[in-house]
Amino acid sequence: MLGEDDESRVVRVGGGIELRFHELARAYPDIVDDPVLDFLVTARSELVSVEVSVRTLDGDGLDVFLAELAEDFRGWEGLRTWRSLEGDLTLSARHSGRSVYLTWGLHDRPPSEEWRFEVTTAHAPGEDMRNLADEISLFLESEPRP
């Protein structure tokens, strides 16, 4: 679900544990056409609160990855995976025939890599996945904060 939060675009994913994509920013705002985008991903529920800063090159194609999953609504064999530039956010997708299961991984940055957190969200193939891809695309294309 796409919304506004503190004057910035927010994408919320999930049910029991909510994933929030927010606070999009350019890593080097003084560089013209800087491709490095940073944003926060927060996983939150009554029992957990985890936040990671994600570094990408113009989103690393996360929206394209999700759009391809939506286009393959009839299903695929095995696991499809995506990772951000520095591996702080990972995503794996499995199609069960009735649902697409997305496992979102939030990771501590190297070299420490002391922790990692994963949560799986279920989505209907096709339109539900297309909406998620569109929301992530709008988020990544929104005006980064200074």
Q: What kind of region is each of these model predictions?
A:
Residues 33-38, 81, 89-113:
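Intrinsic, low-complexity N-terminal interaction/targeting segments
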Residues 1-48, 54-55, 139-146:
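Charged, alpha-helix-forming regions
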Residues 62-69, 132, 136:
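Short, structured motif recognition centered on aromatic/hydrophobic residues
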Residues 15-17, 46-50, 87, 98, ...:
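Short acidic/polar mixed-charge low-complexity motifs
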Residues 32-34, 48-62, 119-130:
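Short, low-complexity cationic-aromatic patches
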Residues 109-146:
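Mixed-charge, glycine-accented linear interaction segment located at domain edges/termini
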Residues 74-89, 142-146:
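Short glycine-rich, low-complexity/disordered patches
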Residues 13-14, 20-24, 42-44, 53-57, ...:
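A structural detector for beta-sheet-dominated domains
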